[in-house]
Amino acid sequence: MNYRNIRAIIVDLDGTLLHTDKTLSKYTIQTLEKCRQQGIYIMIATARPLRNTLPYTKMFHFDAMVVSNGARIVCQGKREERNIPKETALEFVRALSEHENLRITLETSDSAYSNYPIEEYETVVIKDLAPIIEKEMILKVLVHLDRADTLSTVQKEMPKSMH
């Protein structure tokens, strides 16, 4: 393989760039820096929201970041976002809310709101998520399921446009 043709390296954080303890090793940082010195752009693509990637940008300056499963891109100090339309998010969350004990999290530009407490993450717990959708731009809706059969039940009841 001719490495001189490589223009960019795009990596995930969790399970790829980071160790199991969520650290970035000195060796990895040195390797990324050597690639950059060869004119290669270093970027990350992650499901994490921007606020959860920022600690790693203090260890290494990434040329671009694709975060929140692609809902937000940060490149050269500029941000581009693809929000879920309010009506779509409202319809989706209302349909999900009809299922008792379904755990829902909304990711916005700056926060996460959930209808249940999540110990590992900083979230604002709020029973009714509709007012959040009305006032905030929603980047991502996460549905946390304990059982796979619940997913198939919920999917059958959702409009096809929401799959």
Residue ranges and their predicted role:
Residues 3-6, 39, 99-101, 136-138:
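A general structural motif
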Residues 5-22, 44:
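Asp-based phosphoryl-transfer active-site loop
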Residues 12, 68, 144:
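Conserved residues at the C-terminal ends of beta-strands
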Residues 18, 54, 155:
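A short local structural element in Rossmann-fold oxidoreductases
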Residues 91, 95, 102-163:
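Conserved acidic, metal-coordinating active-site core of Asp-based
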